[in-house]
Amino acid sequence: MKKFIILTPLIVLLTICVFCIIYLLSNKDPLKPPSALLNKDLPLFESKSLYDLDKVIKTNDFKNKKVLINFFASWCLPCKVEHPLFFTLSEDHQDLFILGFNHKDNIEDAKKYLADDGNPYSFVGIDSDGMIALEFGVFGLPETFLINEDGKIIYKFMGPLTKEIIENELEPLL
């Protein structure tokens, strides 16, 4: 009976260790949770242009186009870190439509940010109330999505993109 009492916690601990090792070897990144939107249709949205409130962009405007969607804000420091990379993407993939959604930001602050740092986007939409981000399941800024020509979300990245992430994860899909 004494042996059983001593061995039981050891067996439980060993079992927990085995499950932890199996999980760690499964190559799942806990910082990169799967998106429920992957391989789903692009959510329906309509957004006014940051620069011309009479111009509107809609989900239907992207039929047969590859689209990179980036949610950003002028007050978002990680957004500023990844910002220059969108210029490179724009130059390297001229057929790629890069849509920036300015999220819960002051319009004048957003315009100043893009005037100072440059505008790499094909179109900048306004998401002042956060409803478009909600449709995309945006958790925090920045977040980036890649949509294929069939209108399906094929890639999502939470956080600032880096050269390595673009080269290893995004480029193969472009």
Predicted regions and their residues:
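Conserved N-terminal glycine/acidic-rich loop preference
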Residues: 63-66, 110, 120
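Thiol/disulfide oxidoreductase modules built on the thioredoxin-like
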Residues: 115-120, 127-174
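Short extracytoplasmic
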Residues: 40-67
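A generic structural signal for alpha->beta connector loops
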Residues: 44, 95, 121-122
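N-terminal targeting signals for export/organelle localization
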Residues: 1-48
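Structural microenvironment flanking redox-active thiols in thiol-disulfide oxidoreductases
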Residues: 81-118, 128-135
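Short active-site neighborhood of thiol/selenol oxidoreductases, capturing the structured segment around
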Residues: 57-80, 86
